[in-house]
Amino acid sequence: MGLHWQWLIWALVGLHVALATKWYGGGMDFNDPTAWLDDHLPCAQDLVVFPEYYPALLPLPEDISIDGLVFPREGAILLAEESTITFGSDKQPSCESDENKAYLKPPKSSKWFDPGTWTDKSKEFSTFTPELERIPCDDEQVIIKGHGPLAFDLENVQYLRLGQLILAGSSISKTYLEQLISRDLGQFLFYNAEYVQVEYYRGELCGCHKDFERLLEPVCHNVQEQCETPHCLSPVRPLGSCCLICGAILSTPTTHCTEGSRKELVAQISNLISQESLKDQIGLHVEFVGSQKFGNCLQAVVTDRHKYSERSLEFLQQNEHNWNKTGTTLKVSGRPYNPNVSFSSIVLILFCMALVGLVSVVILAHFMPENPYLNRIPQWIHDPRLWRWRHLGLRLRRNLLFNRFDNGGAEGGSSEGGASGVDRLGIMAYDPESGEVRERAFDNPMFEQGGALEEAAKESQEQDEILSVPKMETGDLDARSVVDEQELTEINLETCEADTDEETI
């Protein structure tokens, strides 16, 4: 009886290992138009031309019909046992080309520790699934299939740990994989594989990886830029995850990583979610996490499926008594918030709204002068006396720029030297035709009154008459004129002396 139970346990373990499979279907397939230049698939009369340097392994399809192959200087192709290549077949009217050549595009490599390289057909990865569970686990089966170029970058890979490797339909053993990596063919299939050690495991591990903390840095190096900013305060990071999330984490230490204990916790939490009708609102992920340094634990990640609203946090806190065990820890994130909206952005938005409102009011005041409230705004803008903020120490210049345009002859004006544009600001212009005093304009210095024009014309005429008087002729004085001048001077002196004597008497 005990023997039957032992066989049953091993069968269940084998079933679990078989279901845990990572698939690689990346690369552009040989029969995909995107793998060729100008999206031109090779016809039966076409010559297939490889790039000069083709750093990849290309598995050719089982049956192709072409005119020939131009191999690269460096590269590799893989032919299956049942593959058939037909050269020089008949032309097909539906497939013709002018050049009779088809050019393959250069291949692209995929990183082994990149979660985007692998898929799991047995389950769908959610946004809160740890990144270390999206790459091949240490005991998982890895299937590499397809007819596209194969090239894997083993950057930061120290141990290539697998459960089983199936390449192009063939199972690859640990010994053959070690030999393949060291050969020339393996250098096209695996980059940076000089010091990589190959290890195979068969389900004897706890969790996805043997030491998850050693893989965090190389794996997160490939996905760190893809992490979204969490919309909550104090986000949490599950074990084996590179990105912070909003939700709750329930961790229970364990010594035996059995599938039964994991399913028991999954069923317990799922039943509570169904009882509260939260299946469409709350997401759940339960998995073992193993570490030689920190020990093993069973981790349950509970998050909101849609926008974070603390529903997952409330659910775990309300039902905490259902799984209250020794050593169980609960980590929760804070309240939701939008990280894209900060205090400075709010202030900027309010300032822009106030500025738009102010400009709108000024425009309305300009086009609605009859409004009893809006018509005061232009006066407030043009009146500098309202701009004196004594408590700020600001003063307005008294020598205004347009003082020379003030009408000094208008009524109410001041012609005294002490007057200024600020004192006579009520009168800024005078309209000579209507006799109105304009308070929102200035005099045009080129515009004069009628009387002023006549007076200016009269002054101009008098000046012309003065300029028209003939000038006196001048010439050199001769000796006779000099003698006459001396005689006149003597007569004047004698007359002055006689007058002086009479005054003395």
Swiss-Prot record:
Compartments reported by the entry: Cell membrane
Basic and acidic residues biased stretches: 473-482
Membrane topology: Single-pass type I membrane protein
Predominant location: membrane
Region listing for Disordered, in residue ranges: 451-482
Segments traversing the membrane: 345-365
A Pfam family per the record: Amnionless
Cellular component terms (Gene Ontology): apical plasma membrane; endocytic vesicle; membrane; receptor complex
Topological domains annotated Extracellular: 21-344
Physiological role: Required in the nephrocyte for normal uptake of proteins and elimination of toxins, and for maintenance of endocytic trafficking structures. May function together with Cubn.
Tissue specificity field: Specifically expressed in nephrocytes.
Protein's GO biological process: clathrin-dependent endocytosis; nephrocyte filtration; protein localization; protein transport; receptor-mediated endocytosis; renal protein absorption
Cytoplasmic side: 366-505
Any GO molecular function: cargo receptor activity
Key words, A-Z: Cell membrane, Membrane, Protein transport, Signal, Transmembrane, Transmembrane helix, Transport
Record's protein name: Protein amnionless
Signal peptide (from-to): 1-20
InterPro entries xref list: AMN
